[in-house]
């Protein structure tokens, strides 16, 4: 399937599973394949958890053609109370170290995501999250707003957090 995109010189292919690299062998297999079959045009976009990247993964991607891949890393927040409350596991210090290591190769575009409106996140802690992410110098810092999806944990907790959000897609938090 990847070869089809390469043969047809598709400009960009996105892997939108934010846990793409949680299966180490699978990620390595795909990255090796696209490196070996690089057509010089197609860019592959991966959403991943940076803090679980292993050294051999970093070494492999650091040796790729500039522009062959780009990484989207969903930080969401660096406020530990927020991260705990939304049931995420993330070591931001490790994320920052890995993003910095990858940046040193000057071949991989990285963008890190933050979300406004999360539990226990106020203006000051959001500013701190912004500063923390800004300091690691990703090529792009993407800001999004919390969306309260039907059936999600946040929808079940909406009264506890006093969430007011749009009742039509994309269900963004208003306040």
Could you say what each language-model-derived stretch is?
Residues 24-25, 81-86, 116-124, 136-175:
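Flexible glycine/acidic-rich beta-alpha junction loops that bind and position SAM and/or redox cofactors
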Residues 55-61, 119-137:
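Catalytic cores of alpha/beta
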Residues 1-111, 116-118:
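Conserved SAM/AdoMet-binding glycine-rich loop
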Residues 31-33, 129, 158-162:
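Short, hinge-like loop/turn segments at secondary-structure boundaries
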């Amino acid at each position: 399937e990847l070869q089809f995109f390469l043969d047809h010189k598709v400009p960009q292919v996105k892997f939108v599973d934010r846990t793409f690299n949680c299966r180490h062998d699978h990620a390595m297999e795909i990255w090796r394949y696209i490196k070996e079959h690089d057509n010089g045009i197609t860019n592959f976009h991966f959403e991943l958890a940076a803090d679980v990247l292993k050294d051999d993964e970093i070494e492999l991607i650091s040796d790729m053609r500039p522009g062959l891949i780009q990484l989207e890393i969903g930080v969401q927040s660096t406020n530990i109370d927020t991260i705990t409350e939304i049931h995420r596991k993330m070591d931001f210090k490790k994320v920052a170290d890995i993003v910095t290591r990858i940046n040193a190769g000057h071949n991989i575009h990285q963008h890190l995501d933050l979300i406004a409106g999360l539990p226990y996140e106020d203006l000051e802690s959001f500013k701190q999250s912004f500063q923390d992410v800004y300091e690691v110098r990703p090529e792009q810092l993407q800001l999004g707003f919390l969306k309260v999806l039907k059936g999600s944990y946040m929808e079940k907790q909406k009264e506890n957090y006093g969430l007011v959000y749009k009742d039509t897609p994309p269900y963004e938090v208003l306040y």
